[in-house]
From Swiss-Prot:
Residues 1-47 form a transit peptide. This is Ferritin-1, chloroplastic. One of its GO terms (molecular function) is ferric iron binding. Its EC number is 1.16.3.1. Residues 48-86 are annotated as: Extension peptide (EP). GO terms for cellular component: chloroplast. It is an enzyme of class 1 (oxidoreductase). Oligomer of 24 subunits. There are two types of subunits: L (light) chain and H (heavy) chain. The major chain can be light or heavy, depending on the species and tissue type. The functional molecule forms a roughly spherical shell with a diameter of 12 nm and contains a central cavity into which the insoluble mineral iron core is deposited. Its main location: plastid. Belongs to the ferritin family. Keywords: Chloroplast, Iron, Iron storage, Metal-binding, Oxidoreductase, Plastid, Transit peptide.
Length: 254
C-alpha cells in the first residue's frame, strides 16, 4: 500500500578526513547510518548506527551526535509535568532563586510603604515619595526578572509570604527623611548579602550560567545603589531636620 511504502538510503562518509598519504584502510570504520522514511509519516528515523570511537584518529570525525545524545543527562522527559528545558539546574539553586524573589518583593513592599508615607498631605515630601516609589518599582522588576530566569532554567516559581512593613517613619531624633534613608541603606546591604549568597550557591553547584546571571544583572547595580543612598544619608546628616530637608527633597524631585 502507498501509505506504508518506505524509501531508504545508506549514508556513509563521502570525504576522507585523513591526512594526505594515509590509507583509509589503516583507520577503522567511522560511521554507517541507515535512514528509513515513511511516506505517510512525519520525519526520518535513524535505523542503525555503528561507531567505533575508541580507535578513531584525531583527524577523524570527533563529534558523534547520535551516540552522544544517548547520555542519561540529556534524556528528554516524557511526563507532562516535568520541565523539558531543565539541564544541570540543582534543587538548591532553584530554592535559592525562590528565596531571592521573596527578598526582592519584601524590599519593594517596604519602599512602597515609604512612598505612601512621604506622599501624605501632612508630610508632603514629594521628592522622597518619588524616590521610594521608583525604588519599589525597581525591586519588583528584580523579582520578576528572577521569576523569568527560574522559568528559563526549568525551575518552579514558589512565592513565599511577604511581611507587612511599618507605615510610619517618624523619628524624634533623626527625623523621618534620615530615618527612612538609613533603613533603605540597610535593606540594600541586606539584599547585597542575599545576592552574594545566591552566587555562592551557584558556584557550589558548578552552575556558571546562574553565576553569570547574578553577576551581570544584579551585583554591579547593587553596589551603585548602596553608594547612592550612602551619599543621600551624608547630605541629610549635614542639613539636619529643619528647612534643609525641604531643599534636599526638591533636589530629588527635580
Amino acid at each position: 500500500m502507498a501509505s506504508k511504502a518506505l524509501s531508504s538510503f545508506t549514508a556513509k562518509p563521502a570525504v576522507s578526513l585523513l591526512p594526505h598519504g594515509v590509507s583509509s584502510s589503516a583507520s577503522p570504520s567511522v560511521m554507517s547510518l541507515s535512514f528509513s522514511r515513511h511516506t505517510g509519516g512525519r520525519g526520518v528515523v535513524a535505523a542503525s548506527s555503528t561507531v567505533d570511537t575508541n580507535n578513531m584518529p584525531m583527524t577523524g570525525v570527533v563529534f558523534q551526535p547520535f551516540e552522544e545524545v544517548k547520555k542519561a543527562d540529556l534524556a528528554i522527559p516524557i511526563t507532562s509535568n516535568a520541565s523539558l528545558a531543565r539541564q544541570r539546574y540543582a534543587d538548591s539553586s532553584e530554592a535559592a532563586i525562590n528565596e531571592q524573589i521573596n527578598v526582592e518583593y519584601n524590599v519593594s513592599y517596604v519602599y512602597h510603604s515609604m512612598y505612601a508615607y512621604f506622599d501624605r498631605d501632612n508630610v508632603a515630601l514629594k521628592g522622597l515619595a518619588k524616590f521610594f516609589k521608583e525604588s519599589s518599582d525597581e525591586e519588583r522588576e528584580h523579582a520578576e526578572k528572577f521569576m523569568e530566569y527560574q522559568n528559563q532554567r526549568g525551575g518552579r516559581v514558589t512565592l513565599h509570604p511577604i511581611v507587612s512593613p511599618i507605615s510610619d517613619f517618624e523619628h524624634a531624633e533623626k527625623g523621618d527623611a534620615l530615618y527612612a534613608m538609613e533603613l533603605a541603606l540597610s535593606l540594600e546591604k541586606l539584599t547585597n548579602e542575599k545576592l552574594l549568597n545566591l552566587h555562592r550557591v551557584a558556584s557550589e553547584n558548578n552552575d556558571p550560567q546562574l553565576a553569570d546571571f547574578v553577576e551581570s544583572e544584579f551585583l554591579g547595580e547593587q553596589i551603585e545603589a548602596i553608594k547612592k543612598i550612602s551619599d543621600f544619608i551624608t547630605q541629610l546628616r549635614m542639613v539636619g531636620k529643619g528647612h534643609g530637608v525641604w531643599h534636599f527633597d526638591q533636589m530629588l524631585l527635580n
